[in-house]
Amino acid sequence: MQREDVLGEALKLLELQGIANTTLEMVAERVDYPLDELRRFWPDKEAILYDALRYLSQQIDVWRRQLMLDETQTAEQKLLARYQALSECVKNNRYPGCLFIAACTFYPDPGHPIHQLADQQKSAAYDFTHELLTTLEVDDPAMVAKQMELVLEGCLSRMLVNRSQADVDTAHRLAEDILRFARCRQGGALT
């Protein structure tokens, strides 16, 4: 069994069962691999959680890079693409971004490696948004990026509890409104 396969299945379990309820034993059972063998690579639940979140983080980073290089989409489409990706996740009963929110709650110490990993992902998301907003030459891209990221984080938090497409739709609409408002301000319509 490949490491990525184990981590992928661990992520699915974490999304379904939550960080608190997922055990190393559950992962071993899900991947049909002896627990003792699994412990050679991940001695405890925290180790596999860290690796699974790091693996997810790498996947998200690759997705963002590919999106940035996609010349068929406008900057606006790229900014809103996360909501289409989240809709796809909801459709497949997957809630990966929520794990970073949950990880910060479960490991509140900012110095903890899992909390730091979640913070790095949050920072990378902000940088992605800020870069695209700067490309669009919106007024105060840092503030608009903070607003858009706050909407995204709120959406992920709601998904953690409700697992609802309606929350994704609402957040998508709000992000569109923030972007439209920023573009109007850029054009001098709101001065």
From Swiss-Prot:
InterPro entries: Homeodomain-like_sf, HTH_TetR, Tet_transcr_reg_TetR-rel_C_sf. GO terms for biological process: negative regulation of DNA-templated transcription. GO terms for molecular function: DNA binding. Transmembrane segments: none annotated. SUPFAM superfamilies: Homeodomain-like (SSF46689), Tetracyclin repressor-like, C-terminal domain (SSF48498). Residues 1-60 form the HTH tetR-type domain. Keywords: DNA-binding, Transcription, Transcription regulation. The keyword Secreted does not apply. This is HTH-type transcriptional regulator YjdC. It comes from Escherichia coli (strain K12). The lineage of its organism: Bacteria, Pseudomonadati, Pseudomonadota, Gammaproteobacteria, Enterobacterales.
